[in-house]
């Protein structure tokens, strides 16, 4: 059955007056190349934790954190998707091959994606570490259509949801039927001999909203017509189940952890514990956007915009994204970029594009000009030759990949706006359906099309 995905560029009405930016399409590609040159261990094809490292051995010796590796893995997929959107065959081939090498390197590093191995060096010992990979692997399947990516994505989701017989935990899902209150728990403790969860255990935004995102992606990609599994701990679920659980977890997390677009870090036994973090805002935006796309309920879109508005009105300084200095916190901007892309391009909210580009310009202006990498603090110049962690450095290339300098925001050339909105067109402007609807895309040959003034890749 044909599948199609929205790709990078919104072809909506022309933007209001544009600011002038000094970064170009080639500069953006180079920023990703520079990131990989400094941080990718090309022997193992996993990422190092900082620029002074020679090798990425393990958690204790040079390798970036397991969950951040998933964010860096997202970036190579984004590079490939952008190359597809731009019709750049050479880069498509390059990044498809690089993606495969990184996938195999990460799999080899992390116990062959055995999510029941909870060793604290190369294994899986926190629920959200696993769920970030669930998301990245689901996206890999959506991008490259290789069944193994979907298999590991589903296995990891179910391992988090139901727990592991080998590890002995009872799963992240805070089942209301068990009196646990709803949502998702962040961890199990002790790691090697877990106790059953209690209602007051920590339920964080960083597991709840990624769970929603993962469930939405799996709903979008698993086949229809599956039988309902009967095992106590299944390794896959039905298409309908994933959407049902996405909506359930979102409803709990939105009610419990969010106030007017501001996302709390989590909750123990009392009220929400508010501390602003950019990645929590990002995953709230992403979860809201995906549910809007799947259900058509505009309330989800409005919540996504509330989350974005809170960032730019309350968390930014002069419109520049906040930078946090805690271990691994530099990666937060890369996560935010991922889901702001969804809001801007896939949900048509181009009013945020200028703010994202402003941040890209500041990041670019404050890079180390010799190495091409940034310290992640867009308000502070990066000292030449200084030690930089890969988490913080990921912000610049992540933004550059997701918000192309050469975006076409003008209507399809030579076609009245009303007709362009209604029809399906090839990239060169040939009409293939004058009254196009998204469901018609499945009847077309594989390739790139414009439908509803958005680029769509049909597989």
PLM regions: where:
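Positively charged n-region of N-terminal signal peptides that target proteins for export
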Residues: 1-4, 459
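Hydrophobic h-region of N-terminal signal peptides that target proteins for export
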Residues: 8-18
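CBM-like carbohydrate-recognition segments
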Residues: 20-128, 143, 163, 167-182, ...
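Mobile, glycine-rich extracellular loop/lid and propeptide segments
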Residues: 124-137, 144-156, 160
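Aromatic- and glycine-enriched pocket-lining scaffold segments that form the walls
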Residues: 150-248
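Noncatalytic carbohydrate-binding groove/subsite architecture in carbohydrate-active enzymes
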Residues: 209-210, 214-275, 282, 287, ...
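C-terminal outer-membrane/trafficking sorting elements
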Residues: 413-459
């Amino acid at each position: 059955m044909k599948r199609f995905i929205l790709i990078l560029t919104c072809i909506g009405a022309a933007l209001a007056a544009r600011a002038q930016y000094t970064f170009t399409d080639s500069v953006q590609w180079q920023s990703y190349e520079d990131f990989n040159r400094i941080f990718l261990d090309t022997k193992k094809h996993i990422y190092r934790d900082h620029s002074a490292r020679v090798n990425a051995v393990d958690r204790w010796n040079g390798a970036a954190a397991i969950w951040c590796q998933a964010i860096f893995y997202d970036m190579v997929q984004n590079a490939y998707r952008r190359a597809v959107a731009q019709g750049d065959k050479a880069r498509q081939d390059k990044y498809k091959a690089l993606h495969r090498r990184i996938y195999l390197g990460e799999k080899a590093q992390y116990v062959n994606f055995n999510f029941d191995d909870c060793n604290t060096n190369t294994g899986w010992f926190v629920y959200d570490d696993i769920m970030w990979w669930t998301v990245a692997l689901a996206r890999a399947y959506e991008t490259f259509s290789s069944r193994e990516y979907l298999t590991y994505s589903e296995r990891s989701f179910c391992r988090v949801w139901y727990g592991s017989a080998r590890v002995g935990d009872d799963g992240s899902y805070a089942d209301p039927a068990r009196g646990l209150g709803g949502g998702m728990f962040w961890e199990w403790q002790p790691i090697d001999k877990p106790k059953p969860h209690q209602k007051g255990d920590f339920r964080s935004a960083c597991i709840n909203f990624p769970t929603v995102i993962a469930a939405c992606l799996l709903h979008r990609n698993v086949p229809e017509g599956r039988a309902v599994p009967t095992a106590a701990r299944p390794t896959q679920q039905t298409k309908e189940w994933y959407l049902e659980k996405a909506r359930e977890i979102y409803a709990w997390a939105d009610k419990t952890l969010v106030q007017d677009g501001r996302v709390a870090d989590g909750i123990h036994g009392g009220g929400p514990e508010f501390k602003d973090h950019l990645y929590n805002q990002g995953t709230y935006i992403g979860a809201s956007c995906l549910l809007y796309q799947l259900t058509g309920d505009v309330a989800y879109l409005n919540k996504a915009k509330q989350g974005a508005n809170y960032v730019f009105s309350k968390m930014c300084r002069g419109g520049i994204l906040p930078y946090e200095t805690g271990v691994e916190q530099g990666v937060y901007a890369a996560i935010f970029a991922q889901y702001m892309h969804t809001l801007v391009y896939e949900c048509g909210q181009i009013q945020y594009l200028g703010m994202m580009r402003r941040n890209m310009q500041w990041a670019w202006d404050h890079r180390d000009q010799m190495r091409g990498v940034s310290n992640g603090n867009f308000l502070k110049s990066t000292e030449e030759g200084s030690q930089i962690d890969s988490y913080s450095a990921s912000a610049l290339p992540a933004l550059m990949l997701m918000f192309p300098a050469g975006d076409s925001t003008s209507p399809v050339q030579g076609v009245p706006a009303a007709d362009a909105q209604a029809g399906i067109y090839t990239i060169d402007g040939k009409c293939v359906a004058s009254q196009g609807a998204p469901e018609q895309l499945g009847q077309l040959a594989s390739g790139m099309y414009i439908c509803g003034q958005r680029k769509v890749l049909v597989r």
